[in-house]
Swiss-Prot record:
Organism: Naja atra (Chinese cobra)
SUPFAM superfamilies with a match to the protein in the record: Snake toxin-like
Localization in the cell: Secreted; Target cell membrane
InterPro entries recorded: Cytotoxin_Cobra, Snake_3FTx, Snake_toxin-like_sf, Snake_toxin_con_site, Toxin_cobra-type
Name of the molecule in the record: Cardiotoxin 7a
First and last residue of the signal peptide: 1-21
Any single Gene Ontology cellular-component annotation: membrane
Length: 83
């Protein structure tokens, strides 16, 4: 009986497909974050290139790493709250 119950629990978990959701910071403050929507598997952080202090000006989730611009340098990562 216990084996049957355990099997049902495992099958339920597999069928639910609990899926992995990435959490990324989304403000300049390092303790505020959001869960990324499906398909957004990267966190990014943008800093000003010409400014001596490299504090982030923009953070969030992305499906692809944004390209650097004349003003902003982007750094991407794929682990929890890595930006």
């Amino acid at each position: 009986m216990k084996t049957l119950l355990l099997t049902l629990v495992v099958v339920t978990i597999v069928c639910l497909d609990l899926g992995y959701t990435l959490k990324c910071h989304n403000t300049q403050l390092p303790f505020i974050y959001k869960t990324c929507p499906e398909g957004k598997n990267l966190c990014f952080k943008a800093t000003l290139k010409k400014f001596p202090l490299k504090f982030p000006v923009k953070r969030g989730c992305a499906d692809n790493c944004p390209k650097n611009s004349a003003l902003l340098k982007y750094v991407c990562c794929s682990t929890e709250k890595c930006n």
